[in-house]
From Swiss-Prot:
PROSITE patterns: CATALASE_1, CATALASE_2, CATALASE_3. It comes from Dictyostelium discoideum (Social amoeba). The gene is catB. SUPFAM superfamilies: Class I glutamine amidotransferase-like (SSF52317), Heme-dependent catalase-like (SSF56634). It catalyses: 2 H2O2 = O2 + 2 H2O. Occurs in almost all aerobically respiring organisms and serves to protect cells from the toxic effects of hydrogen peroxide. Its accumulation in prespore cells affords the spores protection from oxidation during prolonged dormancy. Required for normal developmental timing, possibly through a regulatory role in differentiation and morphogenesis. Heme binds at residue 356. Its cofactor is heme. Pfam families: Catalase (PF00199), Catalase-rel (PF06628), Catalase_C (PF18011). InterPro entries: Catalase, Catalase_AS, Catalase_clade2, Catalase_clade2_helical, Catalase_core, Catalase_haem_BS, Catalase_immune_responsive, Catalase_large_C. This is Catalase-B. GO terms for molecular function: catalase activity; heme binding; metal ion binding. Thermostable. Still active after heating at 65 degrees Celsius for 15 minures. The active site is at residues 69, 142. Keywords: Cytoplasm, Heme, Hydrogen peroxide, Iron, Metal-binding, Oxidoreductase, Peroxidase.
Length: 692
């Protein structure tokens, strides 16, 4: 157990222990199911303080949800530094090899409220709180390295535009509506980020299969006081991959908690999600070679120009004991930094430094939110802040000011030093004329958007075209659709614009006479998800369909083989009743075909069975739909023995992800190979006629 979990234990209670029920003030209760009345059928009495306390507390159980990132899930873990990075930063948690620091992670969607679905198309928040020996450090980022706006002044406008429309509070959990595309069509700096959302990055297959980014440029300050600008990255050890859009929509309807459930179950089973933290180092000489400004949050730095240097590994290994107390009350603030880490002049970052702190005051009830157990640092903390709503600390002593002599000057100030000193901002030289002007280096809104488009594989480009078509078609105003195609997409790529325009019935207008600032940028292979797979099947989910007459050995041997490779295998049947195998053995399914559809899995295996079992499956419409849907979603499917006739029954065209054999031995290696490649992309052009 790490320091943070040990600290939280002091605040926990176990109501399963043999204790008596009491009021909030400790008075034992003799009745907690009936109100106090004047006779069995008489009116309820005002003096019933037990009833009033219970109802009053219930009436105030909810707190304001986050304005953005309301829908999220979190868990505990630890960060392990790979080595002593003190030449880069004096931050203590990176100061020596194998130094272990407790963390809490929260991953979220942006647009929807707490009750929205997990698998909507959206940016995903990726926030990590490090409980370091020098105080809390919050790295508050997203699963995309760029943002929609360049200056914090536009943040309320952006959020108002993407959120549900004010007249009808729709749509929930999506950006496919007029106000968002009206804003973005008039705000070309959003082009790059919207393109990322329309890509497969907007619909990750699971929370553990997405990258995280710090978005902004930060400073690392080393022991000598030298500053280096950095961009911070989280790379999942599980690889990076996504759902298909049709799949994501269906999952949202059949299990709106799909992402959080999968994350929770992985942790409970001991299959811990892991990410590697890395940094791109941006010294001044290197910055001069860039055609963009590192202070512009709508830009990324291609890894081909500046590699990501690994710093350490994060392991998420424990679920919360109470969602509200931990995940809902955790407060991430961009302003939470430690010695060795400092800010840049990114104008969006500068506004976030204020905004994240400010929003906690209303959401968590005042300035003492850092005293809530999940937010407390694990190192000693003391200052002259006093009182306020929900104060938990009892301060002794007569002085609450600095300087003082009454309490011998305590708490003392710590001088900045090379090691474990007090925080002092980097002494940056600043000069300039006060103005609202934006730097000319921020004016190129399309070069990197085009780079991202050109970096995509063909199937990724097809998905982007389909996503724009779906989203913009939901806009009811023709002028919004026309403007976005002509103001934004035309300036990203002509093929993209032409195909989306055709799908929307929009006419591409003659090229504007107003020139746009744009340069050629080489494609970046590091941006394409097929290049980011892990090469294994760890944490992948496989459905094994069993009915009466299935071959017991084939099921067990396949299951054992896949689980040894790190996959999760579930036996699925038409009912939850035990299934009698061909040799008389019994198997217990863990899910039903209807309750655990193919969209919940990455691959399907139909084991060797008797002709009776094959007949049962062939006559089961739910099963046939199951296979058709898995095929349409480009998943690996294998049939063993006589059940291979189902392939012919469904007229499925052959490809390398549709496997036939006499049992698990014939298909195991091909199954692994196909699943490790995530989806059978060559199949995508063939599935348009599949009625699933």
């Amino acid at each position: 157990m790490n320091k943070k979990l040990e600290q939280l234990e002091k605040f926990k209670t176990n109501d399963k222990n043999p204790v008596y029920s009491t009021t909030n003030t400790g008075v034992s209760l003799s009745d907690d199911a009936n109100s106090l009345k004047a006779g069995p059928r008489g009116p309820t009495l005002l003096e019933d303080f037990v009833l009033r306390e219970k109802i009053t507390h219930f009436d105030h159980e909810r707190i304001p949800e986050r304005i953005v990132h309301a829908r999220g899930t979190g868990a505990h873990g630890y960060f392990l530094s790979y080595k002593d990075h003190s030449k880069l930063t004096k931050a203590d948690f990176l100061s020596k090899q194998d130094k272990k620091t407790p963390v809490f992670i929260r991953i979220s969607t942006v647009q929807g409220p707490r009750g929205s679905a997990d698998t909507v198309r959206d940016v995903h928040g990726f926030a990590v709180k490090f409980y370091t020996d020098e105080g809390n450090y919050d790295l508050v980022g997203n699963n995309m390295p760029v943002f929609f706006i360049q200056d914090a002044s536009s943040f309320p406008d952006f959020v108002h535009a993407v959120k549900m429309e004010p007249q009808n509070e729709m749509p929930t959990g999506g950006s496919a509506h007029d106000t968002f595309y009206d804003f973005c069509g008039l705000k070309p700096e959003s082009a790059h980020s919207v393109l990322w959302v329309m890509s497969d990055r907007g619909i990750p297959i699971s929370l553990r299969h997405q990258q995280g980014f710090g978005v902004h440029s930060y400073r690392f300050i080393n022991q000598e006081g030298k500053s280096t600008f950095v961009k911070l990255h989280w790379k999942p050890l599980s690889g990076t991959c996504s759902l298909l859009w049709d799949e994501a929509q269906k999952i949202a309807g059949k299990d709106c908690d799909y992402h959080r459930r999968r994350f929770w179950e992985d942790i409970e089973s001991g299959d811990f999600p892991q990410w590697e933290l890395g940094a791109q180092l941006l010294d001044e000489d290197l910055q001069k070679k860039f055609d963009f400004d590192i202070l512009d949050p709508t830009k990324l730095i291609p890894e081909e120009l500046t590699p990501v240097i690994p710093l350490g590994r994060m392991v998420i290994d424990r679920n919360p004991d109470n969602f509200f107390a931990e995940t809902e009350q955790v407060a991430f603030c961009v302003s939470h930094v430690v010695p060795g880490i400092d800010f840049s002049n990114d104008p969006l970052l500068q506004g976030r430094i204020f905004s994240y702190l400010d929003t906690q005051l209303s959401r968590l009830g005042g300035p003492n939110f850092n005293e809530i157990p999940i937010n407390r640092p694990v190192c000693p903390f003391a200052n002259n802040q006093r009182d306020g709503i929900h104060r938990m600390t009892i301060n002794k002593g007569g002085a609450s000011y600095f300087p003082n002599s009454i309490d011998k000057g305590y708490p003392l100030l710590k001088e900045p030093s090379a090691n474990k000193g007090g925080f002092r901002p980097y002494p940056e030289n600043i000069s300039g004329t006060k103005s609202y002007d934006r730097s000319e280096t921020f004016e190129d809104h399309f070069s990197q958007a085009t780079m991202f488009w050109n970096s995509m594989s063909q199937h990724e480009k097809n998905h982007i075209i389909a996503a724009y078509t779906f989203e913009i078609s939901k806009c009811s105003r023709p002028e919004v659709r026309t403007r976005y195609v002509n103001n934004i997409l035309v300036n990203i790529d002509s093929v993209l614009a032409e195909k989306v325009a055709k799908n929307l019935g929009v006419k591409i207008e003659p090229t504007s006479t107003k020139p746009i600032k744009k340069i050629m940028v080489k494609p970046s292979p590091a941006l394409s998800q097929p290049n980011l797979l892990s090469g294994d099947i760890v944490s992948r989910r496989i459905s094994v369909i069993i009915e009466k007459g299935v071959d017991y050995d084939d099921v067990i041997n396949f299951k054992d083989d896949m689980e040894k490779r790190g996959a999760m295998v579930m036996l699925v049947s038409s009912t939850l009743a035990q299934v009698e195998c061909s040799g008389g053995e019994m198997l217990s399914p863990k899910g039903t075909i209807i309750g655990n559809p193919s969209i919940f899995f990455d691959a399907v295996y139909v084991p060797k069975s008797t002709e009776e079992a094959t007949k049962i499956l062939s006559d089961d419409g739910n099963f046939l739909h199951y296979i058709l849907e898995a095929f349409k979603h480009l998943k690996t499917i294998a049939f063993g023995g006589s059940v291979s006739v189902i392939k012919e029954l469904l007229r499925l065209p052959q490809d390398h992800g549709l496997l036939l054999g006499n049992g698990y031995k014939d298909i195991t290696e091909q199954f692994f190979y196909s699943l490790a490649h995530h989806r059978v992309w060559e199949r995508e052009s063939k599935v348009s006629k599949i009625p699933a």
